[in-house]
Amino acid sequence: MVANEFKEEFRMAEQYDVVVIGGGPAGNAMASGLKAQGKTVLIVEADLWGGTCPNRGCDPKKILLSAVEARQAAQHLQGQGLIGAPKIDWPALMAHKRGYTDGINDGTLNGLKGQDIATLHGQAHFQSDNQLAVGDRVVSATDYVVATGQRPAILPITGHEYFKTSTDFLDLDQMPKRVTFVGGGYVGFELATIANAAGADVHVIHHNDRPLKAFDADLVKDLMAAMTADGITFDLNTDVQAITKTATGLQLTADNFELTTDLVISSAGRIPNADQLGLANVGVTFDRHGIQVNDHLQTANPHIYAIGDVSDTPVPKLTPVAGFEARYLVGELTHPGAAIKYPVVPTQVFAAPKLVQVGISAAAATEHPDEYRVNILDMTKWFTYYRFGAQQAQAKVVVAKASGQVVDATLLSDVADEMINYFTLLIEKNVTLPDLQRLVLAYPTPASDLQYLY
């Protein structure tokens, strides 16, 4: 083979139908779906194969929470059949977590290769409309899909270099005695729950008096009361201005506020991984909310799409949403059609107890009392919760008066994360109480309570 023929063969090998940038849940689903449709696909990942969720996000967090939940269950039944509550052995729990996460990178990569999907590891950077550089390689495609996700935001304050992130927390070898979370979103609440159960003195600092602003204010207050009773301190209306290293730890300062701690986690939101891609070179725009896309998930460049957490869409940034968008876009790139239409999306805070919501929100419903009724229920003494000594179980369920259909549910309980999926089905499929009563559900289970919540 002469040199020119070799160059031509190499160039052709670098041409694909679709290049997917990002090897997380969205990108992997995208690549697998396109490959199944007969497309030639290259997937590029700059960090860990598998992405945030299984490596340093929802999955390892839930593994750590498993011990927290078991400990809490034993505590609730003290004097009611159990004697002595277990303590969390953090190094052993972390080893359990790593037993799962350590295999994600290689397992994901091998899974892609097993599907005969081409892979590249490195930072992708658009050079022009038809050239994407990955290290010293240059590839091109008919279409590109950006699925690079998000990363934790770091507040730009004096001493910001002392901030650690959720990534660091989920891989701690030892739990410090004092842990502080700056930011009262779901990440701060969830990791605070874990740290507190593991024996740390925990503070959650938030800049106003409304943490978890996307959730029902009343049930957020109930959750905070429960977490406070467990020993977590909430410092509201506090804007941290500086972090200083001292002989006794890390000192956080704000107006009329000082706190010394051992570990400071920035839990003040997440930002899109869009700034290293060279998007300006191809006419694609983004801001702190993500890459701008239309209702076909298409950017300003007609051959570049964005899905998952990196895209600016009107839905929560969640792994199942990313998967939904990937499935939609596989269809759009193979058989173009209708704009994306999202189903109802449940959101949750895996604290103790758990707070979940799906639908239009009770607050929105109260603005239209002629259209909706809001059922507010204290379920704490119901059998489902009494049997394991639950401290509280609350619900707000919104029903449309005209149709009798549930349009929103917000729940606070130890089994709320299971209940919310039932409500998601009820809302999405427009199930009325008579519809539900025509079913026979297993009893006694949380699902058998549904008919009493309409």
PLM segments and residue spans:
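Glycine-rich flavin
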Residues: 6, 13-16, 32-39, 44-175, ...
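Glycine-rich dinucleotide-binding loop and its adjacent helix/turn
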Residues: 58, 146-201, 205, 280-282, ...
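Short hydrophobic core segments
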Residues: 19-21, 124, 139-149, 181-182, ...
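Hydrophobic "anchor" residues
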Residues: 60, 132, 272, 299, ...
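Conserved beta-strand elements of the Class I
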Residues: 19, 42, 179-180, 305
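FAD-site-proximal beta/loop scaffold in flavoenzymes
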Residues: 161-176, 258-332
